[in-house]
Amino acid sequence: MSDVQALRIDRLSSADPSQVARWEAFVMACPAATFFHRAGWQTVLREVFGHATYFLYAHQNGEIQGVLPLGEIRSRLFGHSLTSLPFAVYGGVAASNDEARDALEAHAQQLARTLGAEHLELRHTEQRHPDWPAQDLYVTFRKEIAPKEEDNLLAIPRKQRAMVRKGIKLGLTSAIDATVDRFFALYADNVHRHGTPAFPKRYFQALRDTFGADCEVLTVSSAEGQPLSSVLSFYFRDEVLPYYAGDDEAARDLAANDFKYWELMRRACARGLKVFDYGRSKVGTGPYAFKKNWGFEPKPLHYEFCLYQREAIPQNNPNNAKYRLLIQAWKRMPLPMANWLGPFIVRNLG
């Protein structure tokens, strides 16, 4: 009689340390997994935003063979969705074999129907379902970090390298912050100038509390000590991912933005990290051009959808023409009011 058990799908309980430890061990070892597959996102989504989470894992004979973190968003403004993963650039299934991968996706589709979701979205880095509707708006930028600091500097194209050297010449400095205070002030002001709502400060504090040393804030200051530019980054295995950033209006003239990313790369090199993940950008935008100018090549992201109660993929992004008037109005709103109102909107964008 065989002792082989059937593959099972279960839901992660964040209250069970042994389950969390097994999940985390699998994610750290699975080549297909990313920082956004980590178990801590379940806590962040629930405690900061109040969203229901379904962190599914496939296991057999006591071994996890795949994970699929899902978050459910119910919004009168933006609809009802089940996504892997809200507020993340990557997601979908991370599995060690096709059986686990297929079983998790099938379970997610059934779960979405049971919940009455309008759509299921899986944010894949590789195409999984050519026959599913897909969002082709986003690309990611990743590049290897050379072992030597000077080689990384020389790998930056001439124009942007000159900006880095300008920042150095102007006496800009960088420091790792113990709090999110300076970062949030720069971030909130920055997104307000662009006409988009800001996440609440407690979200960034929750990221720091949840992920510890794997979530770090680096802030660049002028020679006189004025904070100019800041970035909150994630560390995963041998990679660094600058994820949220903010700049003072004076940062551009002082080359603080280029200097900031150089300092992050330089420090990552010193730590022996291998990959600089510049993150997601929309095709044709300023951030897209900025990363290209740094010598990074875009790679398409495959955000694939199952549509249940809608006919087309939702376009809840600033490129949507129907949001242009709202963006202009948001820019004119006083910053304290925008910081108060923003979290009520952004929690549902995902």
Q: Where are these predicted regions, by residue range?
A:
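Aromatic (often tryptophan-rich) hydrophobic motifs at membrane interfaces
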Residues: 56-68, 75-77, 88, 96-111, ...
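Active-site/acyl-donor-binding loops of N-acyltransferases
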Residues: 2-6, 72, 126-151, 273-274, ...
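A conserved beta-strand-loop-helix scaffold within acyl/acetyltransferase catalytic domains
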Residues: 6-61, 68-78, 124-253
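Acyl/amide activation-and-transfer machinery of modular secondary-metabolite enzymes
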Residues: 84-92, 136-143
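Short intrinsically disordered coil segments
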Residues: 85, 154-163, 317-324
